[in-house]
Design a protein with these regions (language model features):
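Bacterial N-terminal signal peptides that target proteins for export
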Residues: 1-6
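Low-complexity, acidic/polar, glycine-enriched regions of mature
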Residues: 19-179
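Hydrophobic h-region of N-terminal signal peptides that target proteins for export
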Residues: 11-18
């Protein structure tokens, strides 16, 4: 009798502890940061981010990660200096986490709360707007994260004793698909 009760209990409760209701995979991604100096500005671009979303009970948790050294500005000296300034050897990954309602994929715009780990620091960004476009089973998400150097306690690099501006917006263009 106890064995039957235990078996019934396990059969009823295991699905609640089981796998996700649905999952999303990052298919392609372009991330671009922009820094500006009175004498010039530059952008670093990466196409190597990886990501996954796990949805359960109406909520989706997303994680996106990209190597700091994967950003390319077109100037290898600048890229090496960027890795040094951002402590990329010690903290080689940028990690972004967010939680969204599963129904968010049905809207044209989402406002996401982001947690970003970069250069050994964690910064929170509230209600960052992203545009969504769904075609077939692919969902394209694009927007700009209003990051700053000071958010991550990065000393602004300087050229001719003039530091770059604190603003470091990151343009995001991602394509996701359900797994």
């Amino acid at each position: 009798m106890n064995r039957k009760i235990l078996t019934a209990f396990l059969l009823l409760t295991l699905p609640a502890f089981g796998g996700a209701d649905s999952q999303w995979v990052l298919e392609q991604c372009t991330l671009s940061y922009h820094v500006s100096h009175p004498l010039h500005s530059s952008e670093g671009v990466s196409h190597t981010a990886r990501g996954k979303g796990v949805c359960h009970q109406g909520q989706c948790d997303f994680l996106i990660a990209v190597a700091v050294k994967s950003f390319d500005s077109g100037d290898s000296n600048r890229d090496i200096h960027m890795v040094q300034v951002t402590r990329g050897a010690q903290f080689p990954m940028v990690v972004v986490r967010t939680r969204l309602p599963e129904t968010a994929s049905a809207t044209a715009t989402i406002h996401a709360d982001l947690e970003i780990q970069f250069a050994g620091q964690t910064a929170q960004y509230k209600q960052v707007a992203f545009e969504l476009a769904t075609q077939g089973n692919q969902t394209r998400i694009s927007g700009t994260i209003p990051a700053t150097l000071s958010d991550f306690k990065i000393d602004p690099p300087s050229l001719l004793a003039i530091p770059v501006k604190n603003e470091m917006p990151v343009r995001v263009d991602m394509t996701w698909h359900p797994q």
